[in-house]
A protein has these predicted regions:
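Short, contiguous alpha-helical
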Residues: 26-64, 110-153
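Hydrophobic packing residues in well-ordered alpha-helices of helical domains and bundles
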Residues: 6, 10, 37, 41, ...
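Helix-adjacent hinge/juxtasegments
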Residues: 58-99
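Charge-rich alpha-helical segments
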Residues: 5-6, 10, 34, 83, ...
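Alpha-helical membrane insertion/targeting regions
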Residues: 2-16, 27, 69-72, 76
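Amphipathic, well-ordered alpha-helical segments in soluble domains
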Residues: 9-19, 47, 81, 131-134
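A mid-sequence interfacial segment
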Residues: 86-125
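Short terminal or interdomain "cap/linker" segment that borders an active site or interface and mediates
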Residues: 150-169
């Protein structure tokens, strides 16, 4: 179930980005505090990359993102990365493999927290949806010609709640 949700979120992103031009993808948007859609996408993609890097090393560190500017400026490259990450997720087993999460909230100290791959994949879905909501606002305000899936940037719990409300009325 978590794997399917992850793949669905990445497909939504891929489908949306396939409609954008490079100029739209890289344009600094006032409604996004002068960040671009590409910057939000890079941030999201790099979290997935940190997860898979951590899966191979045993320690995830989301602060150790590479901040690869190609992801925020080159749509073709980014679309290919999304496909590669989807492939990795699709081939991951739904096991709860133990892994450690390194967190650092100040300059001097860090903590190691025990977690597992599936828990972190759940976090990837929620984190992605959060950034997709911001991307959605940027597109709705600036690029009205882009078609946005009705569920893009909407939490699964909100989608279910809206469905329940529509059934009960």
């Amino acid at each position: 179930m978590t794997i399917n949700a992850s793949l669905s979120v990445l497909k939504q992103l891929h489908d949306l980005l396939a409609q954008l031009t490079t100029d739209e993808y890289t344009q600094k948007l006032p409604v996004l505090n002068e960040s671009s859609i590409g910057q939000h996408v890079r941030h999201t993609i790099e979290f997935f990359q940190c997860l898979f890097e951590g899966f191979s090393t045993g320690i995830i560190n989301y602060d150790a993102r590479k901040r690869n500017l190609l992801i925020e400026t080159n749509l073709g490259y980014t679309l290919q990365l999304i496909e590669e990450i989807s492939f990795l997720i699709n081939n991951a087993s739904e096991g709860h493999f133990p892994i450690q999460l390194k967190v650092n909230f100040d300059d001097e100290n860090f903590e190691i927290i025990e977690t597992n791959f599936m828990r972190e994949l759940v976090y990837m879905v929620e984190h992605s949806i959060h950034h997709f909501a911001l991307i959605r606002v940027g597109i709705q305000v600036n690029f009205k010609h882009i078609t946005i899936d009705s569920d893009f940037g909407v939490a699964y719990s909100t989608i279910r709640h809206k469905q329940e409300l529509s059934v009960s009325h």
